[in-house]
Regions:
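Acyl-donor-binding surface of acyltransferase catalytic domains
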Residues: 85, 112-191, 302-303
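N-terminal charged segments
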Residues: 10-13, 23, 41-125, 140
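Conserved active-site tyrosine of GNAT-family acetyltransferases
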Residues: 143, 288, 293
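Flexible, substrate/cofactor-facing loop regions flanked by secondary structure
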Residues: 165-240
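Conserved acetyl-CoA-binding loop-helix of GNAT-fold acetyltransferases
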Residues: 112-121, 240-246, 250-267, 272, ...
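Conserved beta-strand-loop-alpha-helix junction that forms the acyl-donor binding cleft
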Residues: 134-139, 246, 275-285, 301-307
Length: 307
């Protein structure tokens, strides 16, 4: 937001502006500047209050966040081939079993020459998987004839701009998911396959934790959080596997557990937070917007045509 307001007598100019986050509209207009300053202006001194368009996200920022997210969900095996990061997770989740063009642009092999493509295919074939590409905005496009799908929205926030819970937390946080946590997580509506535990527990050069809200012997809500560093020196905490028990939905538990796990990350040095959510999951997107997340970029998957 940009706030223009009147200055008291004695200033050389009658008006001034401040750009920042709108904190409150009543009883006074309150704006928090990027440097943390909070400006409070009575309504009768406000000249204009205008929403600014979102700052465009640079390609380097997309690459940096994708690298941090890949370390937070690395699968069980990773390698680099011609500037492509390949992950393998024994088939559990698409993003843990896909190749992404996350190297520097001049180091990424030319898929359309066929040489790099064949190397990627061979690596996955050795592990019994077909090649799937994960293609973030502006970092890569699908080869001609390939099928794309699974459009995913990456949402992010500066933790300093969020209002997080304070006081004693009711969320139980552990380093590994226990049996109750695993029983509460239904990946794509089904019970977890055998490889899931290794993928859920994996993190590269970071820290992972599993949060749960309990009511007596019942697990009411769960989520996974992982802290990793991006090449631009931002420390991210990423949320995944957010689930609330069917009988306890629409009671604010999703909002609560996400806020608590972001706080867990902040207390361990995280400055930013992100989530990855399929674009047709309207309920989850609404939850994250309510928490303060904004759109960062999108990615999609590409698969080769069937011979």
């Amino acid at each position: 937001m940009v706030l223009r307001y009147k200055l008291p007598p004695g200033y050389p100019q009658p008006l001034t502006d401040i750009i920042g986050e709108l904190v409150a509209l009543s009883p006074a207009v309150v704006v928090r500047a990027p440097d943390g300053r909070v400006v409070q202006v009575s309504a009768d001194q406000v000249v204009a209050l205008k929403t600014l368009g979102a700052r465009p996200v640079a390609s380097r920022e997309i690459r940096a966040l994708e690298l941090a997210a890949a370390d937070a969900w690395p699968g069980t095996e990773q390698t680099w081939i011609d500037g492509w990061l390949l992950r393998y997770g024994d088939g559990f989740t698409r993003r843990a079993n896909a190749a992404a063009p996350l190297g520097r642009a001049h180091r990424i092999g030319d898929l359309y020459s066929g040489e790099t493509l064949e190397r990627l295919r061979a690596w996955y074939a050795e592990r019994g998987r077909a090649l799937t590409l994960l293609l973030p905005d502006r970092l890569g496009t699908a080869p001609e004839g390939w099928t794309t799908g699974g459009e995913t929205l990456v949402m992010a926030a500066d933790i300093g701009n969020l209002t997080l819970p304070d006081g004693t937390s009711i969320v139980e946080v552990t380093d590994r998911p226990g049996p109750d946590w695993l029983a509460s997580y239904h990946y794509r509506g089904a019970l977890l396959p055998e490889p899931a535990l290794a993928v859920l527990s994996a993190v590269r050069d970071g820290r992972v934790a599993f949060g749960a809200v309990r009511g007596g012997a019942e697990t009411l809500a769960i989520t996974r959080a992982a802290i990793t560093d991006a090449p631009d020196d931002r420390r991210w905490v990423g949320l995944a596997a957010v689930e609330v028990a069917q009988a306890h939905r629409r009671r604010g538990l999703g909002f609560l557990i996400c806020g608590e796990m972001i706080r867990w990350g902040r207390d361990r040095g995280a400055t930013h937070t992100y989530v990855q959510v399929e674009e047709d999951n309207a309920g989850a997107i609404a939850l994250y917007r309510a928490l303060g997340f904004v759109d960062h970029h999108r990615y999609r998957y590409a698969t080769a045509p069937t011979p």
